[in-house]
Amino acid sequence: MMEGRMMNKNYDFSYTQDRELSWLKFNERVLREADKKNVPIFERLKFLEIFTNNLDEFFMVRVGSIHEMSLIHDNHRDIRSDLTPEEQLDEIAKHVRPLYELRDKIFAKVSKELADKKIKRCQIEELEKEEKKKLKTYYEAMILPVLSPIVIGKQHPFPHIPNKILQIGLILKKKEKISFGIIGLPKDVERMILSLIHI
């Protein structure tokens, strides 16, 4: 029945919507909650986290499937939007880029409000000497033992990188030789560390 409807030249696709683009609009509404002044500030951070995690899953599952379909080159069209997989990917990219930009702006806004309440993210250069010392001890005890640096080369081709694992890329120089390395940060390593000196 649906195939017959697709073949009908009079079918108006403006009454239906691509599932992926519809989902992105839903996730945008989640993001907009983080920009509401009447929402408690830590709840706004939570909405930012939910929005970002949702997009991670979206790219892993839905975009991955559409990309695989695009490699088949059979001109299959979506039954709701009449878009090919390539066209869907283009539309997704057009919608996602502004969302990430908006996410970053909202995060900067929330971070400033937190800083006004004496809650702020600090770079290593901003720490006091005693804080740096305690942080170094924490790093050597809790982080360094679980790191596994990899230098990419002929003997070590680029490895499979698991989803949702933070990877740090490094350009390594030794005399005239330049190489590339990566360090994966395991999920159980804390991304944020409270200033131990003030606890």
Task: State each model region's role.
Residues 1-2, 199:
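N-terminal amphipathic/basic-hydrophobic helices that include classical n-h-c signal peptides
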Residues 4-18:
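Charged, compositionally biased N-terminal leader segments and the immediate start
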Residues 17-25, 31-39, 43-46:
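N-terminal amphipathic, basic-rich helices that act as targeting or association modules
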Residues 19-23, 43, 51, 81-88, ...:
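Secondary-structure capping and boundary motifs in well-ordered enzyme cores
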Residues 30, 47, 197-199:
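Conserved small/polar residues in nucleotide/adenosyl-binding loops
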Residues 35-38, 48-124:
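Extended, charge-enriched "interface" segments that sit outside catalytic cores
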Residues 99-116, 120-196:
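Duplex nucleic acid-engaging cores and interfaces of nucleic-acid transaction enzymes
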